Amino acid sequence: MTEELLREIRNVRLVALDIDGTLMDADKRFPEVNCRSLQACEKRGMKLALISGRSFELMRGFARELGIHPILAACNGARIEAGENGPTISENTFTRAEAERVCRTLEDSGMYFNAYRRGKCYMGNPEVRPSLGPRYAHHIPGTIDDPRYPYETVCDRARLWGEGLDGVYKFVALGEAYDPGFDRLQAELSNMQLSVSSASKRNKEFMPSGVDKGYAVEVLCRELNIPQKQVMAFGDMTNDIPMLRAAGIPVAMENGEDSVKAVARLIAPDHNLGGVGLVLERHLLQKEN
């Protein structure tokens, strides 16, 4: 690590974090070193932001597990809340016409998909690939009992096309790794100028135009009056690239995609080893010692 990078790290005021594949290990648990280091950052006055493709309701539960009080940027930045109880900093949703067009294209594709709006996840085409239902939706239908999943999952086409397409933050097409259907979908929707990303090799995410994790970092820096050069961001997948590019100190996980590592200034150890926490303790928190 260069002296220049060390000097920049000493000035970090905001830590922006992806969740899956970054803060979480492969068993969807948070390594103790990650919890400990983030709590220490918070105690020392640094701002924390969880920036994920996950829903706000789920991220709120994750923040509790981590024992921190971060800003929550859900659905890749479509909804940004100052904390568990708000207030709302920024919110971007599809228009009804946009949502109908995306939903119709997804239905016609024959791919399993989800639509996310406040407090609800609507499932589309569940009968097409029933094996994907339990993997991605956990329970069909009804409210998930696990307190980390406090939102209603809806498996009802009438409700999807009724209430479900008002105020949608994100659509997600789900399939097997590198499903060719993802590219076909993106091509069919290319003239809508949507924001498109992938949180894994098994999905393709569609958000309103201009919404991505980099947008979330920019919004937070304006809100908090923090220069982007004083942001350290951690990520592993291609949907994290805009966030890393918006941060002065982009950190990619060792388990991350090569394209993500290419934009990083620092590589963190594997997520299963608590790579985020190890980097924070070695390079950010030690400045106070």
Locations of regions flagged by a protein language model:
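Mg2+-dependent phosphoryl-transfer enzymes with acidic/Ser/Thr/Gly-rich catalytic loops
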Residues: 5-14, 30-31, 204-289
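Short active-site oxyanion
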Residues: 45-49, 69-70, 170, 229-230, ...
